[in-house]
Amino acid sequence: KGTAMINSISLEEDRYDAVLPVVAGTDLKIVALCMSSDGMPETCDQRLKIADKLINGLVKNNVDIDNIYVDPLVQPIGTDDTYGFEFLDSVAAITTQFKGVHTMCGLSNISFGLPERKYINRNFAVMAIARGLDGLIINPLDRDMMGSIVTAEMLAGRDEFCAEYLQAFRAGIIGNPK
């Protein structure tokens, strides 16, 4: 049940031309990757330019802005120590400039090639949520990750009266399992 989500459109010419007619004028949700024919962007400014073209192109083709999930593309922190903040700055800029658009990412890319990835992933998830990220591709069976996400959502002001946090506590997601 629910609405289908198309993974994904980008500014890579062949992909854009193939996917746009599939989503144009529909109620489908679409992941919009900040990627172009020039390759992976490295800076926030590069991501914003791509996001702008993708979002405006989709909206112009009757895709509801609430159905657009921009993925600014997480790159491994082990290859360049600026990649974490470039991604986080991109999330903040996209959510500020394009009201109603969602942001999401494949979180574990940040820790690729590093030991004890779960700690990096959990901390990066919290940082990204604080900057406005509202969708994550994660392992939902990682109880500690789920607890971190629920807590971050609460601290970011997205959990009225801490209801989700309290529900997660009662369900044993946060705290000692029952």
Language model region names:
Residues 22:
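Metal-dependent catalytic core segments for phosphate chemistry
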Residues 13-19, 40:
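Short, charged, surface-exposed secondary-structure boundary motifs
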Residues 4-13, 34, 82-83:
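Catalytic beta/alpha-barrel core
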Residues 25-174:
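Catalytic alpha/beta core domains of metabolic enzymes, predominantly
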Residues 1:
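N-terminal active-site wall of soluble small-molecule enzyme domains
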